[in-house]
Amino acid sequence: MSEILPYGEDKMGRFGADPEGSDLSFSCRLQDTNSFFAGNQAKRPPKLGQIGRAKRVVIEDDRIDDVLKGMGEKPPSGV
């Protein structure tokens, strides 16, 4: 974790060409950056073998056994 000492108004420089113009006053504090960078590390990218693979699909069809048996018995047509 980093620590940054706050700047006072006397250490802040003026911006712009007009030195008598309105003052730009702001403060910048660095907070805990570990939580900022750790957010994406919780989810790891997939391994090379997992890319493009579908999850398991459950087919709920009463006719699936008949269809699969019928495909094996029929010769290919059009040859």
Swiss-Prot record:
UniProt function note: Potent and specific cellular inhibitor of CaM-kinase II (CAMK2). Traps Ca(2+)/calmodulin on CAMK2.
Record key words, sorted: Cytoplasm, Nucleus, Protein kinase inhibitor, Synapse
Region (Inhibitory domain): 43-69
Highest rank taxon of the organism: Eukaryota
UniProt note on tissues of expression: Expressed in forebrain, hippocampus, midbrain, cerebellum, and testis. Expressed in forebrain, hippocampus, midbrain, and cerebellum (at protein level). In the cortex expressed more in laminae II and III than in laminae IV-VI. Expressed within the pyramidal layer of the hippocampus and granular layer of the dentate gyrus as well as in the olfactory bulb. Diffusely expressed within the caudate-putamen and globus pallidus. Diffusely expressed throughout regions of the midbrain. In cerebellum, expressed within the Purkinje and granular layer. Stronger expressed in the cerebellum.
InterPro entries associated with the record: Camk2n (IPR026779)
GO molecular function: calcium-dependent protein kinase inhibitor activity; protein kinase binding
Family to which the UniProt record says this protein belongs: Belongs to the CAMK2N family.
Originating species: Rattus norvegicus (Rat)
GO cellular component terms, semicolon-separated: cytosol; nucleus; synapse
Keyword Cytoplasm appears in the UniProt entry: yes
Lineage: Eukaryota, Metazoa, Chordata, Craniata, Vertebrata
Gene designation per UniProt: Camk2n2
Region (Disordered): 1-21
GO BP annotations, alphabetical order: regulation of synaptic plasticity
Short name of any one Pfam family annotated for the protein: CaM-KIIN
Protein's name according to its UniProt entry: Calcium/calmodulin-dependent protein kinase II inhibitor 2
